[in-house]
Amino acid sequence: MPKPPDFHSRRHFLKFLAASPLFSALPPQALQEYIISNPAEAINVLEFEAAARKALPPAHWGYLSTGVDDDATLRANREGFAHYQLRTRRLVDTTNIDMSVELFGTKWETPIVLAPSGTLFDPKNEGVIAVARAAQKQKILQILGGIQERSHPIDEVMKARGGPVWYQLYATQQFDSTMQTVKKIEQAGCPVLVWTVDILPGRNLETVQRLRRLDSRECSSCHPTPPNTAPGRAARNTLTYETLRRLKDSTKMKVLVKGIENPEDADLCVQNGADGIIVSNHGGRASESGRATIDSLPEVVQVVRNRVPVLVDDGFRRGTDVFKALALGARAICIGRPYMWGLAAFGDAGVEAVLAIMRREFNLIMAECGKHSVAEITPASIIRA
């Protein structure tokens, strides 16, 4: 006689229910209504989105979820992954899988990187410190958002992280002011500067504007600087490759340029001294190009020709997404919204759970494709759909 299932925890019950044919017969609205109440219940990182929306006030959720204009680029970032299919393998011993990558002489356990964020929301208002603790536990590289550093100095973040973090810079036309920040970060022991160049004044963030109508609270009641009002933003349309050269000449840190989508821009960045490129459209928040970064990535990789490492972000939700980006030539990938969902709903435990799920899925897909190391993931590992 078969042993009855053990329902000693809610998680085990949910797993049993998910395997039942009755579950697949439920109407879509019934499946969408369930919201996880703790990180351990999550089956994938997408389940943290609804939990975050439930936890956040309308304006905060609007800031976290908005794109620009009609959110076409925001949607394209996810839809783009469907343009590529995996070439799975069989009868390959994948008992031992090495997911590690090396970036500027430092070895990391996975190619998954925590992207910077201007504003973070969490139950205990710990923000980037909670993210740093989760990054330390999961041994993940963290990029500290420059706006976050104003409330949590980089040395505090490094202490919570247990090691160096990279720093995201929003340079302004007041170069002396920019250099004060650069020198402070360099003296703190930051090895890499990530210069973000894709945010110009006048963006049309319609989603957040709509949801702000439903929220009468003052921004100062929950965070010191209202989103998108950081000093110097209005001056960023005056920056050029001369700014990049001045940055490179003024610091010993490696300088990556984040926000590149066009191969011509990528080539010019390398010619003007960039140590790396991050292909990014700011999560669909920069401009309404309507194009996914996963589709821009191969063009950038081709023109860079291995002169510098190329990273990519936007739309990553699955281990398969990570695999596809590496096959297209990315050295590593950055995730943003998923860990921010985890943070908003459950604090550092939510961030840690998101990272653990992404790591587990990536490990699994490497095994399914017969890969023992990241170096074995090549363009031949995927096919254009």
Model-predicted segments: where are they?
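C-terminal helical cap(s) of enzyme catalytic domains, especially alpha/beta-barrels
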Residues: 299, 344-362
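An N-cap/entry alpha-helix motif that binds or orients negatively charged groups
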Residues: 34-105, 214-239, 375-377, 383
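Glycine-rich active-site/cofactor-binding loop and its immediate structural neighborhood
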Residues: 109-145, 149
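Alpha/beta enzyme core
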Residues: 180-312, 328-330
